[in-house]
Amino acid sequence: MTRVRRGYIARRRRTKIRLFAATFRGAHSRLTRAATQQKMRALVSAHRDRGKQKRDFRRLWITRINAVTRENGVCYSYSRLMHNLYKRQLLLNRXILAQLAILNKNCLHIISNEIIK
């Protein structure tokens, strides 16, 4: 059986891995086997952290909204605000409410006072 030279195909595969791992440190950017393992690990981390980022931002938005609504009244909280918003069928999501809480507190106070009535 004759020997098969896999130069082009193998070199193209290794080049793709090296381009992905170019910014990694040490042997992880130079050695093919280490770079392949680090690439798989990086992709797993990216997939996991996309979900984690969504949870983290949701928690941040809730904290910001709650802080501003508690300034408004002593017996008023985030949960009551969201309940009243849904009751009135106002379609304001947490991202928009958090931006209002940071950029324009008065607007959020007006909204919360109107939906209490």
From Swiss-Prot:
Its main location: plastid. It comes from the Eukaryota. Keywords: Chloroplast, Plastid, Ribonucleoprotein, Ribosomal protein, RNA-binding, rRNA-binding. SUPFAM superfamilies: Ribosomal protein L20. GO terms for molecular function: rRNA binding; structural constituent of ribosome. GO terms for biological process: ribosomal large subunit assembly; translation. One of its GO terms (cellular component) is chloroplast. InterPro entries: Ribosomal_bL20, RIBOSOMAL_L20_CS, Ribosomal_protein_bL20_C. It is found in: Plastid, Chloroplast. CDD domains: Ribosomal_L20. Belongs to the bacterial ribosomal protein bL20 family. Binds directly to 23S ribosomal RNA and is necessary for the in vitro assembly process of the 50S ribosomal subunit. It is not involved in the protein synthesizing functions of that subunit. This is Large ribosomal subunit protein bL20c. It comes from Acorus gramineus (Dwarf sweet flag).
